[in-house]
Amino acid sequence: MSRVVKPKVASMEEMAAFHTDAYLQHLHKVSEEGDNDDPETLEYGLGYDCPITEGIYDYAAAVGGATLTAAEQLIEGKTRIAVNWPGGWHHAKKDEASGFCYLNDAVLGILKLREKFDRVLYVDMDLHHGDGVEDAFSFTSKVMTVSLHKFSPGFFPGTGDVSDIGLGKGRYYSINVPLQDGIQDDKYYQICEGVLKEVFTTFNPEAVVLQLGADTIAGDPMCSFNMTPEGIGKCLKYVLQWQLPTLILGGGGYHLPNTARCWTYLTALIVGRTLSSEIPDHEFFTEYGPDYVLEITPSCRPDRNDTQKVQEILQSIKGNLKRVV
C-alpha cells in the first residue's frame, strides 16, 4: 500500500546538523534580500551554477525537510521504502553550494537514519560523482558511499577516481566506479551488481540511501551515458531485494520529459504497478513527442568503456573491500 506523506520544511537547526550556521544564515539573507554584491557570496559557492534566486532558501529547506520526513518514516517503521524525487542534492558541502545544490539533503537524510541504524549505505547513480556526500563521510566507517559516474578530464566535479577510497577510519569506505561515455543498460547493471554484491556482503548495511539522478538517460543534454529507465530499474530492484529500509532520492536530469519518464517508471516499479506505454493526456502532453510513449530508446553512440579497463576497476574495488574491517 503506497501513500503520500506531507513533508515538513526543515528548520535552520535541522539543516545545521550538517551545514554551518554562517552558510545557512547567508543563504537565508541573500534569498530574502537578493545579492548585494556581498564578497562572501562567492566564497559560499553562490553564483555561477548556483545562482541566487528569490526564495531559494525556502525551496532548499522544503527539499531538505522532505528528505528528513522520508528518513523519519523509515526510522519509525511506518514504511520500508520512502521516496523524495526532488531531493538528491549531492554536491553541496557544509559551507558551500555547488553544482545546482544549495543544501545536501542526502547527507541530512543519512545523519537522520544514523540515529537508529548503525551502518548506512549510500549508492549514487547520478551521471556526476556524489562528491558532497563522499566528503561528508570520508572519515567514518559507519557510512559507506558508492558512486557510479562519468569520470573524464574537465567533467564536473572532477573527483571520484577509483583511487579515491576515503580517509582515516573511513579508508576503504568510499567506493568510486569511474565510467566513460556511451555505457548502456546491460554493462551498467553488470558493473553495478558486481560492486553492490561485494559491498553488501562486506559492509552488511542496516539501511540504504539511493540517489537516482536521471542525467544518465539517453537523450539528456549531457550527451554522456546511454541508459534507459529499465537499466536503472534493474539496479534499483537489485537493492530492493535486500529488504532493507531504503530512502530513494532524485538528482540530475536535464531533459525534463525523459526525467519524468524515468522517475515515473521507477515509482511504478517501487509500488509494484504496471503502467501503460502511452503517455496520458495532460497539460504537458506535447513535450513527450514525437512518439508519446513511456519508453526511451538508446541512441546509436559507441560505448567507450573498454572491457579490460572495467575489469581492472572492479578488481581494484574488490581488493579495497577486502581491507574493510
UniProtKB/Swiss-Prot annotation:
A Pfam cross-reference name: Hist_deacetyl
Chain intervals for the UniProt region annotation (Histone deacetylase): 1-272
Entry EC number(s): 3.5.1.98, 3.5.1.-
Gene from which the chain derives: hdac8
Description of how activity is regulated: Its activity is inhibited by trichostatin A (TSA) and butyrate, 2 well known histone deacetylase inhibitors.
Catalytic activity field: N(6)-acetyl-L-lysyl-[histone] + H2O = L-lysyl-[histone] + acetate; N(6)-acetyl-L-lysyl-[protein] + H2O = L-lysyl-[protein] + acetate; N(6)-(2E)-butenoyl-L-lysyl-[protein] + H2O = (2E)-2-butenoate + L-lysyl-[protein]
SUPFAM superfamilies: Arginase/deacetylase
CDD domains per the UniProt record, alphabetical: HDAC8
Gene Ontology terms: biological process: heterochromatin formation
Family annotation (PANTHER family): HISTONE DEACETYLASE 8, HISTONE DEACETYLASE HDAC1-RELATED
GO terms, molecular function: histone deacetylase activity; histone deacetylase activity, hydrolytic mechanism; histone decrotonylase activity; metal ion binding
Protein name: Histone deacetylase 8
Keywords: Chromatin regulator, Chromosome, Cytoplasm, Hydrolase, Metal-binding, Nucleus, Repressor, Transcription, Transcription regulation
Lineage: Eukaryota, Metazoa, Chordata, Craniata, Vertebrata
